[in-house]
Amino acid sequence: GYGRLGTIGDALGIELCEPLTFKGRMGTGSPGGRDPYADPALRLGGQEWRKYRYTYRLWGRLLYNPDADPETWRRFLRAQYGAAANAVEQALGAASRVLPLITVVHGLSGSNNAYWPEIYTDMPIVEGPHAEHFRRDTDGPPTFTGASSFDPSMFYRIDDYADDVVAGRRDGRYGADVVAGWFETLADTAERDLALARTQVADPSDPEFRRLEIDVTVQAGLGRFFAGKYRAGLAYALYLRTKDRAYLQEAVSAYERARAAWAGIVEVTEPVYRANLTFGTGLTGHGHW
């Protein structure tokens, strides 16, 4: 993991930004401080860092010692969630892999001012809205299928993968269908273990559990959105190359699944998060799902 590889190339370790480092930057602060919640029951009373106690514990322990005893974080989970501790750990373990996977396979920009995968500004499969925003830091064409990963030696661009599929060749890199499968597996695992946690936790309405439940649901939804988007992008790219309408129908169906996943995120977050989460001034610096 990060701790074990943090000294690769003579690096001195890993530098972390506290999760709300940029909240309210560039003059975008608002009444209520850094608390992201609109729901009074979930607000943290000026102690927003408490939401991330488990995050800090994992990073601190495992950056210092990649072989740390799991008991050092599991006792915290037992204290917080009782009999649901193991299910919570498993749900978070799957859900927390979704955003790092999105970030590496869908490399829209290396700038945090231009790319916010948590609250994604949709990059169209066909050139359309926001094209100029993406064009600044993305090789053309500024479409979802034309976007590179941050590790192009490991992952195909969708357009390049479609070219190779049609030509009947492969070069060993991971394609869009494989990536979509990973997103689906992570979402399935997170949702399964979260459902188990709901049945085991003493009080499912407890704010500590509700905050976790909402965020795991959102991350699983992001996994399903990007799974559908990758499958839609690949099917559409194959349609353009073959003119086989079956691929076009497949693209539409996959995109409908992606849209449904995104709508599910909106349904979950709209009542609980503030309407405008401000981390900056640009298109990808503030907003809501």
Model-derived regions, located:
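C-terminal non-catalytic alpha-helical accessory regions
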Residues: E18-H286
